[in-house]
């Protein structure tokens, strides 16, 4: 296979409203099967996507769907086309001083329009790829990628084929359009005034139809293992926690729970103590025995302490039970080992409260870590109302005080977003 990559020289400065296809057709000589790689900047200029530089930040805001990462003034964002890139593609290079360029509003539509017009003007069967320069995760340096395409299959799926050793290819899907964009940039460069390149010798990649454009190249945020920067992911991990009351029947990975417990025991605690214990109820039989005993204790309290009749007790205890429906339970316990003894009730109460706060911090860490593992959770206070019963059923030491129970499982539905503004909970003195 022979391959040529040719820069198309002689294209003049492009202004808004220019016939870009006409300028490209006039500047080069084309053949059937040629693939034209066109830098996005000349497309944007022809489409009038030019702003005053003073409007740059506002333009980035307008083009941004979500912020992926922020480092000082620099922003990596997802734009309306699904591209994850620096500054939403708003760029001050290769444009007049005091101006910035936006990406084409619909790069695939731009590629289709260019292809149609160029094929009319040249009489050749062509493909068009609109390119832009991106940074890359895991690696330094920039390279061009495809942001718009027409007449080209942008991906080549090798899955199911075999390599030269007979091994089946299971995951290999080649980003053909990106490979072409990067190769073409070798002759286009960044400051040479050559905005278009021809890749010749790959005519078999050119399709009769315009095709799906670059959409197949764009990984949905929900499928992206690296959808946030490190700092952003750490912040979001805390706020993503929700109380989940409905679970699937999928089993819970005990190793994931133990990783969450490892996070839980990093919580702060008084006097250099470790006041947390986590009882993991991995046996269905144990869960049922505990919940049945707790139900009996609850019914006794309603009957003997609250004076309820049997019908009212039955109605109250018949309501849905998130603990009984969960595939996994954790019973966090507080131990007061290392606490200080005080002779007066004020300081004794404060000492107990210090340890209780530490227990709560451990439970919160557990819940947040479970969210990071992909599990939903719900903290329920019920074991605190029948601690003796819980200790008896689970054979726990007398000094272990159950501090509720945590239901764990895969959420049956996506938890609803909850917005709470910090100012509603803040007083400044």
Curated annotation (Swiss-Prot):
What is the reaction catalyzed?
A: oxidized coenzyme F420-0 + GTP + L-glutamate = oxidized coenzyme F420-1 + GDP + phosphate + H(+); oxidized coenzyme F420-0 + FMN + H(+) = dehydro coenzyme F420-0 + FMNH2; oxidized coenzyme F420-1 + GTP + L-glutamate = oxidized coenzyme F420-2 + GDP + phosphate + H(+)
Q: What molecular functions are annotated in GO for this chain?
A: coenzyme F420-0:L-glutamate ligase activity; coenzyme F420-1:gamma-L-glutamate ligase activity; GTP binding; metal ion binding; oxidoreductase activity
Region (Dehydro-coenzyme F420-0 reductase): which ranges?
Answer: 230-429
Ranges for region Coenzyme F420:L-glutamate ligase: 1-229
Q: Which residues bind GTP?
A: 11-14, 40, 45, 94
Cofactor(s) the protein needs: Mg(2+); Mn(2+); K(+)
Residues that coordinate or bind coenzyme F420-(gamma-Glu)n: 301
Pathway(s) this gene product operates in, as recorded in its UniProt entry: Cofactor biosynthesis; coenzyme F420 biosynthesis
- Enumerate the residues binding FMN: 269, 381, 418
Residues the entry annotates as binding a divalent metal cation 2: 133
Known EC number = 6.3.2.31, 6.3.2.34, 1.3.8.17
Cofactor comment in the record?
Answer: Binds 2 divalent metal cations per subunit. The ions could be magnesium and/or manganese.
Which residues of the sequence carry a binding annotation for a divalent metal cation 1?
A: 91, 132
Indicate the family of this protein.
In the N-terminal section; belongs to the CofE family.
Chain's role: Bifunctional enzyme that catalyzes the GTP-dependent successive addition of two or more gamma-linked L-glutamates to the L-lactyl phosphodiester of 7,8-didemethyl-8-hydroxy-5-deazariboflavin (F420-0) to form polyglutamated F420 derivatives, and the FMNH2-dependent reduction of dehydro-F420-0 to form F420-0.
Fetch the PANTHER family from UniProt.
COENZYME F420:L-GLUTAMATE LIGASE, PTHR47917
Q: What is the name of the protein in this document?
A: Bifunctional F420 biosynthesis protein FbiB
